[in-house]
Amino acid sequence: MGILGWVGLIAVGVLCVRGGLSSTEYVIRSRVAREVGDILKVPCVPLPSDDLDWRYETPSAINYALIDGIFLRYHCPGLDTVLWDRHAQKAYWVNPFLFVAGFLEDLSHPAFPANTQETETRLALYKEIRQALDSRKQAASHTPVKAGCVNFDYSRTRRCVGRQDLGPTNGTSGRTPVLPPDDEAGLQPKPLTTPPPIIATSDPTPRRDAATKSRRRRPHSRRL
């Protein structure tokens, strides 16, 4: 699968949900970025506490063919990954672990090398990104998401929040937004509660009416 195909599967919103308690919702759909410096000056996204879940949402609309830059912020604790559309002047924060997994797969594709120099460069890039990902194992969990959990869920605790939408409730939180208030979405912290997980149960087998029960066929007697 090509890199754009992998990018198409990556979610670009971040939801922070503290299971069972009121918490704050952080969504990073996009940010105004007229030039590279607008991206580089954004602070790193801080790692959540151990009991805090992060979920990424798919954007409503984005043309991946128009992406002009991909930024892997090596100095950030979570390896912040940003896609930049120069024409639209927007930057999208994406799930770094899903993105890097697809990127490394593309780099290791045997059909890529065209010459010795390209092969050496590609292998060096693969090694560098692989080391960056391995050094951040504490920031991600590779445990598969159980059935009934939200798709593309990245969570250190792998808490299953079900398929219900997270609705706002009254509450406060001491955390601050992960992006400055000039984010184009104008996002403000919203208290959330985690809905109970959806547990799939099978319906009991309906009882068959006595009148519909199959009758045993009696053998016919034959006269000799």
Swiss-Prot record:
* UniProt topology in membrane: Peripheral membrane protein
Annotated transmembrane regions: none
Name the residue ranges with Basic residues bias.
213-224
Q: Where is the signal peptide?
A: 1-22
Does the keyword DNA repair feature in the UniProt annotation?
Answer: no
GO CC term (a single one) = host cell Golgi apparatus
- Judging by the UniProt lineage, the source's domain of life is Viruses
What Gene Ontology biological process does one annotation of this record name? symbiont entry into host cell
Residue ranges for the region (Interaction with gL) are 20-161
Chain segments carrying region Interaction with gH: 20-161
Cystine residue pairs = C44-C76, C149-C160
Which keywords annotate this record? Disulfide bond, Fusion of virus membrane with host cell membrane, Fusion of virus membrane with host membrane, Glycoprotein, Host cell membrane, Host Golgi apparatus, Host membrane, Membrane, Signal, Viral envelope protein, Viral penetration into host cytoplasm, Virion, Virus entry into host cell
Q: How is it modified after translation?
A: N-glycosylated, O-glycosylated, and sialylated.
Q: Which residues form a coiled coil?
A: none
As for what it does, the entry says: The heterodimer glycoprotein H-glycoprotein L is required for the fusion of viral and plasma membranes leading to virus entry into the host cell. Acts as a functional inhibitor of gH and maintains gH in an inhibited form. Upon binding to host integrins, gL dissociates from gH leading to activation of the viral fusion glycoproteins gB and gH.
Tell me the protein family, please.
Belongs to the herpesviridae glycoprotein L (gL) family. Alphaherpesvirinae gL subfamily.
Q: How does it assemble?
A: Interacts with glycoprotein H (gH); this interaction is necessary for the correct processing and cell surface expression of gH. The heterodimer gH/gL seems to interact with gB trimers during fusion.
What is this protein called in UniProt?
A: Envelope glycoprotein L
Q: Which organism is it from?
A: Human herpesvirus 1 (strain KOS) (HHV-1)
